[in-house]
Amino acid sequence: MKTKAVRLYGKNDLRLEEFELPQIREDEILAKVISDSICMSSYKAALQGETHKRVPNNVAENPVIIGHEFCGQIVEVGAKWQDRFHPGQKFSIQPALNQKDDPYAAPGYSFQYIGGDCQYIIIPAQVMELNCLLDYNGSAYFYGSLAEPMSCIVGGFHASYHTQQGSYVHKMGIVEGGACALLASAGPMGMGAIDYAIHGDRKPSLLVVTDIG
């Protein structure tokens, strides 16, 4: 079937094209993309092209589909996955596959037939094998697209740690009732961080937000 996509060929070389998708194999899934939010890391990949760590060196000959914050609907399921997924099912995706043999490979950077800026995609076997194709039951597709950036925000909070004098035990996340500063945080990700700080399980007593003047 034919599909349209924004494909990356190299540094500053993005092209909106129509091309033919191959027939899916028994370990693949055909899906329709409904929403895809734009990440600054996609912009970085477009600037760096094949020098980006997630973009293949042969992207000029085998272009990749850009966009990794996407949500959609399954169209056709290969035989291997028919006990887990079905046509019409809504999905979102965890693009950071973290494969042992290729840790930087990710949808939206590294694959010819899967990415968010596309009408129809072929989801490769490793996405399902690594449990990165996620069942989605939200009220709107754009919420599913925002799952990945919000997970990055939550991960950032949980990567922050505190210690007490004389102890090397790391206490992760916000200190209940403590102070929190979010720098350069009036953009989309900053707004998400503010939302999480205010509505998370542990709340700071003081939240200071700054942005670039």
What are these model-derived regions, one by one?
Residues W81, S160, Q164, A197-D201:
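Active-site catalytic pocket residues across diverse enzymes, especially alpha/beta-hydrolases
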Residues E176-G178, L183, I194-G213:
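Adenosine-nucleotide cofactor-binding segment
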Residues K44-H52:
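Short Gly/aromatic-enriched secondary-structure transition segments
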Residues P95-A179:
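NAD(P)H dinucleotide-binding glycine-rich loop of Rossmann-like/cofactor-binding domains
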Residues K2-K4:
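Extreme N-terminal starter segment of soluble prokaryotic enzymes
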Residues V6-L14:
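Extracellular beta-rich ligand/substrate-recognition surface
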Residues C152, P188-M189:
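Hydrophobic/small residue at the entry helix of a nucleotide-binding pocket
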Residues P22-D36, T51-L97, I114-G115, L134-Y136:
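Glycine-rich beta-strand-centered segment in the early N-terminal region that forms part
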